């Protein structure tokens, strides 16, 4: 086993030296590539500071953005090509150190690069070289998830919790507070879940198995522990600020705040267990672990009671909304005042007091406007009575009366206002139930004669005139059938048309001109029957010239030209 491990170390050292020689010859960024290869070699020890300083200088704000992008690309290529857990872990340590101690522009460039491709995606990474490598590979995957969540938290918060300088609330106070203490309710509900998710990934970096005693993993775990203190401090200050604003929130915000408060209590217990596990490691000598206290559970009951009575909506903001109603300023007082007919239809403001002993007054007779109104419920006119015949006869006498068209005829309003717009399709669905009913009052001629009645009189006269018999001519038989093709049967089509209609072309014409024996047979000439179904089922017979019978088969006649089942001679 020891010989195999020694061989693997020698093979790794050979690969590192070969890689360094290649990048010095082929790379444009030779110094940067050499520093990355030496900082992430196969030796199980933390990256050296001299190599890290070269990488920090290549990603500083004074360098071009192309140099920073090349450094990120080189680290990503180194991370995804290796299958050794030591190289992968040391590459993640370099990235973590750059996030903590590097230039702020590096975080922005790394965030932009991660949006195009997940640089820290190591969910399928596994080193099968030894059983110890299995446990170390599992911790490498967990560590990569923490760094990825740290980058996502930076995207939400727009600042780094580790690089943040905690200001002091009072001049004489030693301990400062984070930015979450001064956030408003909306920002607080957005940033606290991101911080809690980062703390969840941090607690998951607890080493297990053979990874507990590896000094490279403990070096990376020390970086994680340093960040846990400020992350917990930011969450704790945010919870205090959340409690102060809780009773001013709406119901949906209060429910979200309650979930954050419950999760904060659970994570406090999990973080305490994580600290207890780290106290047994060698790195515990360099840390002073804080004492964590869970949020009081009594306040949790108060929050649940408030949610039951919390308002469902928030107050309407003072600023105008996007869709607001504004009255039309272009309307004048004449347009807004009702007309005389509308005043009659509006209810009066006078209140008549009627005693219980007096009988109610009879209803007033319907007005002329109400009589002209058309009931839209009776669209078919089933409830409308037949018009009086005497009235129609009196109106027919004035059908041809001349009426002056100088003055425009009054149009019925049907209880509509003066500014009624008939072009609206919504109003047309209601006010125009049928074309016949709505236009009945508009078809009035002089004297009140209806145009439909006048048209029906003319139609009746035209029908009676057409039914009168003409003397001297026989009446046509309505049951006689006429052949539409009778006029074209007696005329032979042109030769071009015959060639088109003949499917066998010139062959059949040549065959027909050959003399063939015919048999004597007295056949009846075809009669011209107008019935198109008279000869149904018979074969068509073409008249041919009678030739003498020389075959000796008697008088049995066979017409080879007209047999549709005869042989064409093609076989």
Swiss-Prot record:
InterPro entries: ANTH_dom, ANTH_dom_sf, ANTH_N_plant, AP180-like, ENTH, ENTH_VHS. Residues 24-161 form the ENTH domain. One of its GO terms (molecular function) is 1-phosphatidylinositol binding. GO terms for biological process: clathrin coat assembly; clathrin-dependent endocytosis. Residues 337-346 have a biased composition (Basic and acidic residues). Residues 325-346, 474-571 are annotated as: Disordered. One of its GO terms (cellular component) is clathrin-coated vesicle. Signal peptide: none annotated. Residues 523-532, 543-571 have a biased composition (Polar residues). Disulfide bonds: none annotated. It is found in: Membrane, Clathrin-coated pit; Golgi apparatus; Cytoplasmic vesicle, Clathrin-coated vesicle. Keywords: Coated pit, Cytoplasmic vesicle, Endocytosis, Golgi apparatus, Membrane. Its main location: membrane. Pfam families: ANTH. PANTHER family: CLATHRIN ASSEMBLY PROTEIN, OS05G0549000 PROTEIN. This is Putative clathrin assembly protein At2g01600. It comes from Arabidopsis thaliana (Mouse-ear cress).
């Amino acid at each position: 086993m020891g010989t195999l491990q020694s061989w693997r170390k020698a093979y790794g050292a050979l690969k590192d030296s070969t890689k360094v020689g290649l990048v010095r010859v082929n790379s444009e960024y030779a110094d940067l590539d050499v520093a990355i290869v030496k900082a992430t070699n196969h030796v199980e020890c933390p990256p050296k500071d001299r190599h890290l300083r070269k990488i920090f200088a290549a990603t500083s704000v004074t360098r071009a953005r192309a140099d920073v992008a090349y450094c990120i690309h080189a680290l990503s290529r180194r991370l995804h090509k290796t299958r050794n857990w030591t190289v992968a872990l040391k590459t993640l340590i370099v990235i973590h150190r750059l996030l903590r101690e590097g230039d702020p522009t590096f975080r922005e460039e790394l965030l932009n690069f991660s949006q195009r491709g997940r640089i820290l995606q190591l969910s399928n990474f596994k080193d099968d070289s030894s059983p110890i490598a299995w446990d170390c590979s599992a911790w490498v995957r967990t560590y990569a998830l923490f760094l990825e969540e740290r980058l996502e938290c930076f995207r939400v918060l727009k600042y780094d919790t580790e690089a943040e300088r905690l200001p002091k609330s009072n001049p004489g106070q030693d301990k400062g507070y984070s930015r979450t203490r001064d956030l408003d309710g909306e920002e607080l509900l957005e940033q606290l879940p991101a911080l809690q998710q980062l703390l969840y990934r941090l607690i998951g970096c607890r080493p297990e198995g053979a990874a507990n005693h590896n000094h490279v993993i403990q070096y990376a775990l020390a970086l994680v522990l340093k960040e846990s203190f400020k992350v917990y401090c930011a969450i704790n200050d945010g919870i205090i600020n959340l409690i102060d604003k809780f009773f001013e929130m709406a119901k949906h915000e209060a429910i979200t705040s309650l979930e954050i408060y419950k999760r904060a209590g659970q994570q406090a217990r999990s973080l305490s267990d994580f600290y207890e596990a780290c106290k047994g490691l060698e790195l515990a000598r360099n840390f002073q672990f804080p004492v964590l206290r869970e949020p009081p559970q009594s306040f949790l009951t108060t929050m649940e009671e408030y949610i039951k009575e919390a308002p469902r909506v928030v107050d309407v903001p003072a600023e105008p909304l996007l869709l607001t109603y504004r009255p039309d300023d272009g309307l004048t007082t004449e347009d807004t005042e009702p007309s005389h007919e509308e005043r009659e239809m509006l209810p009066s403001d006078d209140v008549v007091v009627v005693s219980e002993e007096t009988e109610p007054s009879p209803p007033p007779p319907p007005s002329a406007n109400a009589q002209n109104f058309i009931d839209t419920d009776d669209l078919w006119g089933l409830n409308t009575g037949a018009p009086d015949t005497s009235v129609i006869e009196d109106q027919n006498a004035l059908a041809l009366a001349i009426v002056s068209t100088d003055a425009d005829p009054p149009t019925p309003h049907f209880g509509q206002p003066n500014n009624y717009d008939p072009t609206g399709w919504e109003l047309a669905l209601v006010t125009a139930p049928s074309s016949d009913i709505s236009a009945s009052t508009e078809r009035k001629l002089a004297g009140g004669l209806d145009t439909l009645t006048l048209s029906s009189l003319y139609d009746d006269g035209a029908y009676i005139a057409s039914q009168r018999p003409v003397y001297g001519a026989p009446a046509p038989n309505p049951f006689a059938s006429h052949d539409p093709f009778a006029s074209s049967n007696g005329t032979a089509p042109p030769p071009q048309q015959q060639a088109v209609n003949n499917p066998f072309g010139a062959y059949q014409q040549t065959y027909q001109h050959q003399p063939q024996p015919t048999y004597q047979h007295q056949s009846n000439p075809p009669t011209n029957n107008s019935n198109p179904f008279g000869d149904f089922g018979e074969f068509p017979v073409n008249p041919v010239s009678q030739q003498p019978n020389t075959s000796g088969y008697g008088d049995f006649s066979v017409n080879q030209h007209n047999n549709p089942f005869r042989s064409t001679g093609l076989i």
